[in-house]
């Protein structure tokens, strides 16, 4: 029986949740209409010290090739219709990317936040992979209580480590995107 105590302790250690965020991180505030999202936001997000950079443009266009995210300085959000947002990424050289996003097709609004479509993947199908399991990822965008843009990235996994040890873990990463201007100039 004593042999199983260290193994059980290790399983408990591997199951858990980790959260991180920028200095002076504050919670989400709710918005009533997507018109409130109009504004210009800093592309480079604020995170905990020492963390790799997160760009708002990467959250908006995660699978688009050829975007120099580090060169983009600002993201402009405009309301085009009651359920459509126009988003423009700008650098010092001009517009890098522009797109429209429609509520119900590209995003959902839940509890005063934008929820991007979640992704589910199965990992560990290669023989050398240490974890076999289901991976889940979801991004939520909105405002923090100071009026700045806020991202919460939720990542979770449920699976087996080396096909023997159960694992359930989650990570919440929060990023602040400074709101440079509340209403874009026409």
Predicted regions and their residues:
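Predominantly extracellular/secreted and cell-surface proteins with exposed
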Residues: 78-125
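Short, linear, compositionally biased motifs with a strong N-terminal bias
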Residues: 10-11, 84
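Amphipathic/hydrophobic helical signal segments and adjacent flexible N-terminal regions
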Residues: 2-9, 15-76, 119-127, 135-140, ...
């Amino acid at each position: 029986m004593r042999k199983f105590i260290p193994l059980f302790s290790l399983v408990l250690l591997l199951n858990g949740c980790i959260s991180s965020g920028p200095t002076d991180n504050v919670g989400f505030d709710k918005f009533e209409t997507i018109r409130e999202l109009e504004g210009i936001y800093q592309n480079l997000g604020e995170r905990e010290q020492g963390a790799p950079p997160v760009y708002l443009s990467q959250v908006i266009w995660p699978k688009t090739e050829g975007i120099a995210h580090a060169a983009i300085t600002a993201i402009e959000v405009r309301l085009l219709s009651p359920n459509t947002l126009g988003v423009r990424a700008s650098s010092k050289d001009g517009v890098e990317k522009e797109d429209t996003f429609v509520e119900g097709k590209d995003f959902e609004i839940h509890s005063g936040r934008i929820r991007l479509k979640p992704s589910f993947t199965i990992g560990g199908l290669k023989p050398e992979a240490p974890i076999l399991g289901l991976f889940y990822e979801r991004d939520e965008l909105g405002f923090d209580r100071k009026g700045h843009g806020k991202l919460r990235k939720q990542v979770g996994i449920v699976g087996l480590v080396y096909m023997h040890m159960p694992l359930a873990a989650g990570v919440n990463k929060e990023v602040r995107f400074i709101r440079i201007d509340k209403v874009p100039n026409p």
